[in-house]
Amino acid sequence: MCTDTPCSGSTGSGPTPSRRALLGAALAAPVAPLVLSAPPTWAGIERPRLLVFSRTTGFRHMSIETAVATITDLGAAHGFDVDATEDPTAFTHRGLDAYDAIAFVNTTGDVLEGAQRTALKRFVRRGGGWAGVHSAADTEYSNPFYTRLLAGGRFLAHPLEQPGLMVTESATHRSTRHLPEQWLIPIEEFYSFTSSVRGRSRVLLSIDESSYLQDPNTSNPPTGPENPFPTYPGVSGVMGDHPMAWTHRVGRGRSWYTALGHEITMYYDDRFTQHLLGGLVTVLKHGRKHRSRSYLTLSVEGRPRR
């Protein structure tokens, strides 16, 4: 993966490792081959372009490299170009103009500064697409606009990895229409959020809270020397209404978020990779159709309008 400057991964060349190589010895059991739906129809439009951003200033997920490689593979197979970076200086007005959508993939902490945040805000408000994967909800806490991208669904806590039962809430959205009404995930890290986003977004997936243990979690740890969690003020991970994937409009732009994607094994689950592909296609199509490049339009004086 390229970590200093954006690099194209859509051609299959360059330093981005293959998904199978990245898996290595992480999985003991065989994994079914990736089987996805037919490539989306881009209706004769120019090939869309996606920027994948995976910078971390907090916890760093072991699945990041696999996630980026998976998205690169999806782009190659489904007709969109992928550039991957961990360099925040890519976030300029002119730099982002090259893209139809941006995906924050397991980012953590504050990853952008003032002018970079402004560039992201302008990009989305003028019609660009934004997708967030898993700990994208644990990112940019001091950025009010970023909270809008999440429809207010900020990460609160998570328990240890375990099985959990997902509930499909939209049978028509391209990121969930392939899923059964209920979907048992063998092992994953399930986030709880500061509030439910229902009413502020279109909820696509939720989780059946009776199917897994919300407590103890990262903010309500057990006591004793074997405590696996850091010590935070204790809160419950129980939400009652517990969305796990959603989408909504932000200005002229579109946001899509999934709380899944912590475990490396998720990127070898056809149901999840199809879910991820559907979300990326959603924001890419929106960005290609709606995004304004008006700041490059020359004014009467011949200078770019800002």
Annotate each language-model stretch with its function.
Residues P33-E46:
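C-terminal region of N-terminal signal peptides and the immediate post-cleavage residues
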Residues I45-E46, L156-G251:
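Catalytic beta-strand/loop cores that center a nucleophilic Ser/Cys/Thr
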Residues M1-P17, A28-L34:
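N-terminal secretory signal peptides
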Residues G14-L23, A38-P39:
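Twin-arginine (Tat) signal peptide motif
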Residues G44-P48, S54, M62-E65, A69, ...:
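Extracellular ligand-binding/catalytic regions of CAZymes and related secreted enzymes
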Residues D110-Q182:
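A glycine-rich, often tryptophan-bearing local segment used as a flexible ligand/cofactor-contacting loop or short
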Residues T57-G58, G109, A137-D138, D208-Y212, ...:
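Short, solvent-exposed loop/turn segments at secondary-structure junctions
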Residues V52, F59-E140:
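Helical hinge/lid and interdomain linker segments adjacent to catalytic or ligand-binding clefts
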